[in-house]
Design a protein with these regions (language model features):
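The beta1-alpha1 cofactor-binding region of Rossmann-like NAD(H)/NADP(H)-dependent oxidoreductases
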Residues: 5-6, 27-38, 69
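Substrate-binding pocket helix/loop in short-chain dehydrogenase/reductase
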Residues: 63-64, 68-73
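Active-site loop immediately N-terminal to the catalytic Tyr-X3-Lys motif
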Residues: 65, 118-124, 183
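Active-site helix of classical SDR
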Residues: 87, 129
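Residue(s) in the substrate-gating loop at a strand-loop-helix junction
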Residues: 113
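Active-site-adjacent segment of SDR/Rossmann-fold oxidoreductases
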Residues: 118, 139-149
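C-terminal helical subdomain
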Residues: 153-154, 161, 173-218
Length: 218
């Protein structure tokens, strides 16, 4: 589920070729109606849902003084409200899967960031959203863990994705490019490995927090 159907189609083709089954859902999770419809479409296709990975996000950096408040709104909509909408929509199915599904456990993995653990100059609103994800994850974990829905947060350091490319040129030049030039960053497969580890533990084990960093990153 994402707003990039071309990439979803390519990924689905890889999954199909590997013998799996994939469903492509073109949805904007900042629209609650679309988020709820996407979850429902998934349930109808597969007959249920036992794992949710909230990975959508936006990182727009820069000072608070003179900031473009539309950038704040976009980050709050994607990083916070979108995560809330998909989680709320999926929870009934996850609780049902934990009670009666073949695994007898269900999983929510929220992708946060090191910026949800440590605050830096220029990361203020992005960190606000990611600290919020961390707090929400732990609170929800306490709410549903005894019903065998495991809720965990995965906090990556620097990863080679397009996340930084949406920033203004001056932000990229001052904050992002120098970091990338001196750090051997993670690749998306490293984060996928972390997610897979979290959701494949035995039923009696829950990973509440997983912090994955490049070795070079201080």
């Amino acid at each position: 589920m994402a707003r990039r159907p071309d990439r979803l189609d390519a990924l689905a083709a890889e999954i199909d070729q590997a013998g799996g089954t994939a469903l492509v859902v073109d949805a904007d999770i900042t629209d609650r109606t679309q988020a709820e419809a996407a979850v429902q479409q998934t349930v109808e296709r597969f007959g249920g849902l036992d794992t949710l990975v909230n990975n959508a996000g936006l990182m727009l950096l820069g000072p608070v003084v003179g900031a473009d408040t539309q950038e704040w709104d976009r980050m709050l909509a994607s990083n916070a409200q979108g995560l809330l909408s998909t989680t709320r929509a999926a929870l009934p199915q996850l609780l049902e899967a934990a009670e009666a599904g073949p695994r007898r456990v269900a999983d929510i993995v929220n992708i946060s960031s090191i910026a949800g653990r440590v605050a830096w100059n220029g990361y203020s609103v992005y960190s606000l959203t990611k600290f919020g994800v961390r707090g929400f994850t732990e609170s929800l974990r306490q709410e549903v863990t005894q019903r065998h829905v495991r809720v965990g947060v995965l906090e990556p350091g620097g990863v080679a994705t397009e996340l930084g490319s949406h920033n203004k040129p001056e932000v990229r030049n001052q904050m992002i490019d120098p970091f990338l030039e001196q750090t051997e960053v993670l690749v998306p497969e490293d984060i996928a490995d972390g997610v897979a580890y979290m959701v494949t533990r035995p039923r009696h084990i829950a990973i509440g927090e997983l912090w994955i960093m490049p070795t070079d990153q201080v």
